[in-house]
Amino acid sequence: MDFNEIKNTADKYLMPTYGHFPIALTGGKNASLTASDGRVVIDFTSGIGVNIFGVNDDGWKKAFIEQIDKIQHTSNLYYNEPVAKAAKLLCEKSGVDKVLFCNSGAEANECAIKLARKYSFDRYGENRNTIISLVNSFHGRTMATITATGQEHYHKYFMPFMGGFKYAEAGDKKAFSELLDGTVCAVILEVIQGEGGVVITPRDY
């Protein structure tokens, strides 16, 4: 398929949840990606953080093929060695006690929101459940994470939203401090905001 065929087919059958750049990727190696028209471009997004080893990485492919030759999926109903070993390694390297593997950033943030509120409820009672987020943040497309996202244009069409979220301007310590009352159980923030540019919060924030 050439680019127009790919684009027209995708536009016809895929839900328009994302804006696409006018390019179709067909292959690549490391940070170099090949387009359907033969162009070679550099991937500065790392596949939005997914392809951190680059595209078509030899070590990743070898590990993937070795595992797929054994069993491709077991669900969470059963134990399996690769998951146990990965969890152990992550805990040892990060200093945390437990890890949870998720399918997306939105799912991870949903779990973090639930975990923060559950911990706060158990420790402080039911009236300490507010989560502070930053204006212009982006935390996901589920109902909880789109509420945590501090951008009005994401809030237009999906009312009513989940309660218990407040927003502060990134870098404004005074505005942030004023939100820290006795109802706050957690803060969710991006140290570097990626929506609308690369916005770095000050070190002393």
Task: Please name every model-derived segment.
Residues M1-K29, L77:
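Active-site-adjacent loop/helix segments that line or gate small-molecule/cofactor pockets in enzymes
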Residues A87-L189:
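PLP-dependent aspartate aminotransferase-fold enzymes
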Residues K12, V40-E126:
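Glycine-rich loop-to-alpha-helix module at the N-terminal edge of alpha/beta enzyme cores
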Residues I23-D43:
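Active-site and channel-lining beta-strand-loop segments
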